[in-house]
Amino acid sequence: MAPNLRKSHPLLKMVNNSLIDLPTPPNISAWWNFGSLLGICLTTQILTGLLLAMHYTADTTLAFSSVAHTCRNVQYGWLIRNIHANGASFFFICIYLHIGRGLYYGSYLYKETWNTGILLLLTLMATAFVGYVLPWGQMSFWGATVITNLFSAIPYIGQTIVEWAWGGFSVDNPTLTRFFALHFLLPFMIAGLTLIHLTFLHESGSNNPLGIVSNCDKIPFHPYFSLKDTLGFMLMLLPLTTLALFSPNLLGDPENFTPANPLVTPPHIKPEWYFLFAYAILRSIPNKLGGVLALAASVLILFLSPLLHKSKQRTMAFRPLSQLLFWILIANLFILTWVGSQPVEHPFIIIGQLASLTYFTILLILLPITGALENKMLNY
């Protein structure tokens, strides 16, 4: 009998083991769809980004008008740009839900997968930041100025690092050119990291909602989950196209319709919505270095999740107290996101400070204590 090419060919064999014959727990819910959705987001962003890069000019005098030209004169340029801009938002929605799933169901106990995932998040954040600077509108320019300036809080070498990153003494042409180069490069780095992420995941196999070992009961990925993922793709691409076609500027800042002007500061400098929670934490500390450290900690704290897991059960499925804390944490993140979009004045300052304190308290203190308490209650 002729050998099955899918199982014998060196390249097809890898695809087969990752996407076709992959043994998968039969009870994974729709929360496990977000990994593949992130893959679709990345593919969409790289394709639309490539098409946009063909019409973009990385020069301070031409960047703004080259984006306007793309939207007005290039065939479907407006659509490509709208999908790319809003695709970034969907990318972050998916990655935040994906991380939330990981925290709820204890997926962080696969340490290598979890750590590469956090590196992916950091790379995605860097990509989105440098990408936001490229249209060279007011918020692009001032966002770049404010965020890069944070590095000057690093003692002794800070100012040198900032000027080195800028390529001068302010955000100018060299900054824009290098940000374009980085924005082109980083998505491919994300793609590479994704392969590492998947390699680690396939070492252990997927977690499942019960948090128990499912080696005795697995089903092939195709056709069961390939079909389920296809449904997920449609359910994500539908709102994405709806947003891109009907309300493409809903999530953007009106300030970015004004070309960058170093002499006029916008009344409220704020990042895109997906960075607002971290921005609120940054602003809640009235000291530059302290704020920068809190900003870094707000994301890097995820690295500690495996160490802070004190429960004998893996998931929160059967732990009502931890569930309550988890959902308070989610509500808290919404509050931080809202506060980040408000001006720095009373009552937003105190709300932001309380929400920031609550964020770190829940993750560092309350969740581990609750895990240990639940062990005690269940006589573990």
Swiss-Prot record:
InterPro entries: Cyt_b/b6_C (IPR005798), Cyt_b/b6_C_sf (IPR036150), Cyt_b/b6_N (IPR005797), Cytb/b6-like_sf (IPR027387), Cytochrome_b (IPR030689), Cytochrome_b_C_euk/bac (IPR048260), Cytochrome_b_N_euk/bac (IPR048259), Di-haem_cyt_TM (IPR016174). The chain crosses the membrane at residues 34-54, 78-99, 114-134, 179-199, 227-247, 289-309, 321-341, 348-368. Disulfide bonds: none annotated. GO terms for biological process: mitochondrial electron transport, ubiquinol to cytochrome c. The keyword Ligase does not apply. Heme b b566 binds at H98, H197. GO terms for cellular component: mitochondrial inner membrane; respiratory chain complex III. GO terms for molecular function: metal ion binding; ubiquinol-cytochrome-c reductase activity. Keywords: Electron transport, Heme, Iron, Membrane, Metal-binding, Mitochondrion, Mitochondrion inner membrane, Respiratory chain, Transmembrane, Transmembrane helix, Transport, Ubiquinone. It comes from the Eukaryota. A ubiquinone binds at H202. Binds 2 heme b groups non-covalently. It holds the Pfam family Cytochrom_B_C. It is found in: Mitochondrion inner membrane. SUPFAM superfamilies: a domain/subunit of cytochrome bc1 complex (Ubiquinol-cytochrome c reductase) (SSF81648), Transmembrane di-heme cytochromes (SSF81342). It is a multi-pass membrane protein. Its cofactor is heme b. Heme b b562 binds at H84, H183. Belongs to the cytochrome b family. Heme 1 (or BL or b562) is low-potential and absorbs at about 562 nm, and heme 2 (or BH or b566) is high-potential and absorbs at about 566 nm. Component of the ubiquinol-cytochrome c reductase complex (complex III or cytochrome b-c1 complex) that is part of the mitochondrial respiratory chain. The b-c1 complex mediates electron transfer from ubiquinol to cytochrome c. Contributes to the generation of a proton gradient across the mitochondrial membrane that is then used for ATP synthesis. The cytochrome bc1 complex contains 11 subunits: 3 respiratory subunits (MT-CYB, CYC1 and UQCRFS1), 2 core proteins (UQCRC1 and UQCRC2) and 6 low-molecular weight proteins (UQCRH/QCR6, UQCRB/QCR7, UQCRQ/QCR8, UQCR10/QCR9, UQCR11/QCR10 and a cleavage product of UQCRFS1). This cytochrome bc1 complex then forms a dimer. This is Cytochrome b. It comes from Fregetta tropica. The lineage of its organism: Eukaryota, Metazoa, Chordata, Craniata, Vertebrata.
